[in-house]
Swiss-Prot record:
Job of this protein: Part of an unusual four-component transporter, which is required for protection against the killing factor SdpC (sporulation-delaying protein). Has a role in the assembly of the YknXYZ complex.
TM helices/strands, residue ranges: 38-58, 93-113, 128-148, 171-191, 205-225
UniProt induction comment: Expressed in exponential-phase cells.
Identification of the protein by name: Membrane protein YknW
Membrane topology designation: Multi-pass membrane protein
Species of provenance: Bacillus subtilis (strain 168)
Record's keyword annotation contains Transmembrane: yes
Length: 231
């Protein structure tokens, strides 16, 4: 692989390596601050999201899931039609939502940096978002492969506490947020906000913890609503 180097006034700034975020995140985030990379990482992360979402949807037996819903009065053929629509609708939703999040998250990160007294740009935060999202998208891919090749419950990540601790309803939704790749990405986010956003380590960690806390609360209420709706 050729070395990406940009020369400027006698100095050389290396282009950040997307997969380098796995082994040397601090170095990549410092490079992003000087030379944010977008298009290459965007194509790679988007491709991983698409493959992961497709595998997870194809590995989900929606006919079985629909049996637990209020589907009385539907014939077997109608059930199959609903299951097919749900499968491909869920697949499209996961792909569109996953890619849209890549562009929405940088706005939140930008706000975190501004509130913490740092100075940054949307492009730098977009690059940071793509590098951090590599980890969560790899998690989606891993869980997609597991769902496609095994009979595990695809509603909850096998790499989360929900995949280890038997639970359902709101508790399962909360446990599902404590997922290896998700937590890893939030740790990288804390480092990235410090290195790329230029804010203090403390501010970076506080921002990441608050965002993770919001995710947990959202999952709790989502689980409660689904439990009530399914009651």
């Amino acid at each position: 692989m050729e070395t990406n180097v940009e020369k400027n006034s006698g100095t050389a700034t290396e282009k950040p390596s997307l997969f380098g975020v796995i082994t040397s995140p601090s170095v990549q985030f410092e490079r992003i601050r000087e030379r944010p990379a977008v298009w290459g990482p965007l194509l790679i992360v988007a491709a991983i999201i698409i493959v992961g979402a497709v595998l997870q949807s194809l590995g989900t037996d929606y006919s079985e899931l629909l049996k637990s819903q209020d589907t009385q009065g539907l014939s077997a053929e109608q059930m199959e039609t609903v299951a097919t629509i749900t499968k491909f609708g869920g697949m499209a939703g996961a792909i569109i939502g996953g890619i849209a999040a890549l562009f929405i998250a940088p706005l939140i990160y930008w706000l975190c940096v501004k509130v913490s007294g740092g100075v940054t740009t949307y492009k730098k935060m977009l690059s940071l978002s793509l590098f951090v999202s590599l980890i969560s998208s790899l998690g989606l891919l891993v869980n997609g492969i597991v769902a496609f090749t095994t009979d595990v419950n695809p509603l909850y990540s096998t790499t989360s506490l929900a995949g280890i601790i038997p639970s359902d309803g709101a508790l399962a939704s909360v446990l599902n947020t404590f997922e290896i790749f998700s937590i890893w990405s939030f740790v990288l986010l804390a480092i990235g906000l410090h290195k790329t956003g230029g804010i203090s380590k403390k501010a970076g960690w506080i921002s990441a913890i608050i965002l993770f806390g919001i995710l947990v609360v959202f999952s709790l209420f989502s689980g409660l609503i689904n439990s009530v709706a399914g009651a």
